[in-house]
């Protein structure tokens, strides 16, 4: 069993809930695909730094989500917010071995580790969606931890100034094989399919 989330994490969730659920009109589907217990990897598309909130709110407070955050975000005072929110740092571009090891240990310990295979935000009008080559970290972590790989899609976080609506869809587990690249290809295809339903 994973340790209980810190009070700061719970406080962030409680304070965020009215904003995300009602002001931004968050709606979700596919929650039945998300394991209620045990660790797993949750992989989604990435369009905004706000993505963790709508992705995690439907699972709050019964699941404590842990996020990989790029190391350059870890400056004071933001690092305290990231730590309280369950994040841990990763060096982008070099395949951070320590971050992967930490993620595997967290999943084995019963945590939910959130991954964005695109590796960076895809903003409409700035960069064509789905064009970048995805990273295989989510598939590798799920394989090494022997845990489910759950796809998810997020829509609306690139239009926050309009106050929603925000949509999230969770899909059934992706079969994880020894070929992380092939697993990632199927993962991204499912994320894209889910996104088209939003």
What do these predicted ranges mean?
Residues 1-7, 98-198:
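Non-catalytic C-terminal accessory region of glycerolipid acyltransferases
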Residues 2-36, 54, 76-85:
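A transmembrane-helix-recognition feature enriched in membrane-embedded lipid enzymes
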Residues 16, 84-91, 120-125:
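Short, basic, glycine/proline-bearing loop/turn elements
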Residues 19-21, 60, 81-82, 106, ...:
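A generic structural signal for well-ordered alpha-helical segments
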Residues 24, 93-97, 131:
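A conditional alpha-helix N-cap/helix-loop micro-motif detector
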Residues 30, 69-70, 86, 116-118, ...:
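A secondary-structure boundary/capping signal
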Residues 32, 71, 91, 153, ...:
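Residues at the C-termini of beta-strands that transition into short coil/loop
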Residues 34-94:
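Catalytic core of membrane glycerolipid acyltransferases/transacylases, capturing the structured
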